[in-house]
């Protein structure tokens, strides 16, 4: 029988350890506040996960619904600007 090779997992790096919305005392995330929404979207247009931003689960859910509403209303783009 062949020997099995044990693979070690790469440790995940957490960038922020606190929620910016909780620290600022925010109670509501509005889809019209584009500056906050764009800070939580990466270069390719994807929503940044909470393990990277440190956002709590409650505000991550509110943030994703606000981003999806803003995309639907064409306030923010679905993808990045494709440069030629």
From Swiss-Prot:
Pfam families xref list: Ribosomal_S18
GO biological-process terms attached to the record: translation
Keyword terms, alphabetized: Ribonucleoprotein, Ribosomal protein, RNA-binding, rRNA-binding
One cellular-component annotation, GO: cytosolic small ribosomal subunit
GO molecular function: small ribosomal subunit rRNA binding; structural constituent of ribosome
Bridged cysteine pairs (disulfide): none
InterPro entries hit by this protein: Ribosomal_bS18, Ribosomal_bS18_sf
Assembly and binders: Part of the 30S ribosomal subunit. Forms a tight heterodimer with protein bS6.
Entry function: Binds as a heterodimer with protein bS6 to the central domain of the 16S rRNA, where it helps stabilize the platform of the 30S subunit.
Family to which this protein belongs: Belongs to the bacterial ribosomal protein bS18 family.
Name used for this protein in its record: Small ribosomal subunit protein bS18
Gene: rpsR
């Amino acid at each position: 029988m062949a020997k099995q090779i044990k693979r070690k997992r790469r440790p995940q790096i957490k960038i922020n350890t606190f929620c910016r919305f909780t620290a600022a005392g925010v109670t509501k995330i509005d889809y019209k506040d584009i500056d906050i929404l764009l800070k939580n979207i990466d270069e390719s247009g994807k929503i940044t996960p909470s393990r990277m931003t440190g956002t709590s689960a409650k505000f991550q859910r509110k943030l994703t619904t606000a981003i999806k509403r803003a995309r639907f209303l064409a306030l923010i783009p679905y993808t990045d600007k494709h440069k030629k």
